[in-house]
Amino acid sequence: MDRRDFVRLSAIAGAMAVRGRPLAGQMVFPAASTVRRFDIPPFELEETTIADLQSAMASGRLTARSITQLYLDRIAELDRKGPTLRHVIEVNPDALAIADSLDQERKAGRVRGPLHGIPILLKDNIDTADRMTTTAGSLALAGSIPAHDAFIAARLRAAGAILLGKANLSEWAN
């Protein structure tokens, strides 16, 4: 039994106890054939910290491009194939080119700081003045490309972060 099943069954048992219904024989479990499981391979960077990534880039084991590609592949695996989570609305079409540029800066001895070459997702209500749209999760703003970066987006770019894409959220980010 995994954590989600435990929490679900605990909630059902609590609700039945409040209603005064007997628990024995009342539990109904979905048939095994109705539960869809996805075999999602583990992600090698899942528990990796920014400090770990910086160390790997400094030693030459990883590059900003290789890290960015790993994250793009993972987004495609979870959003477009497999469980189709749709947790990322769009990815930055320039992410790999930006990563290449930051790798060149690193080779030239210029590292902007601890975020240099680190891919980051932004919520879709943060303006980015690039080829990504900002919709705040609303169809009314579909195709909206801001004229200027939001303050946080500009600061992240200046620090060398790679704005990888926009994360999904509810309409108008409420």
In which residue ranges do the predicted regions lie?
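N-terminal secretory signal peptides and thylakoid transit peptides that target proteins
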Residues: 1-14
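Gly/Ser-rich catalytic/binding loops embedded in alpha/beta enzyme cores
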Residues: 16, 27-174
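C-terminal segment of classical bacterial N-terminal signal peptides
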Residues: 19-22
